[in-house]
């Protein structure tokens, strides 16, 4: 296994093997980060959550809950859940939802959702502030693969 010796640049796509990515996710220096892996590149977002992002996040979640309170839908909402396809990809969208028959597909007690075992969410929401280009680019393509 390769050993990452240099610090990983924040909010930048960096060439890395899957093993280096896993090593970074286990590094205590990055424990507060959001991790992404796509096409042999990793990205760690260590940015603090801004007031605007927190407001938008809670507003969107509130809207989802309000909609669900007035409609008969079976939905499981995941807040900042990690989705992993081993040796290929990982992402942590701000909000994700499993709808209908998929609502109960992820059992309680599941940590990182293994996309080799479970389907991807039916709805993924990434709240963009300064990261809009990434959210529409590599981050956005993750769930489509």
Feature locations, PLM:
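Gly/Pro/Ser/Thr-rich low-complexity, intrinsically disordered segments predominantly at protein N-termini
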Residues: 1-144
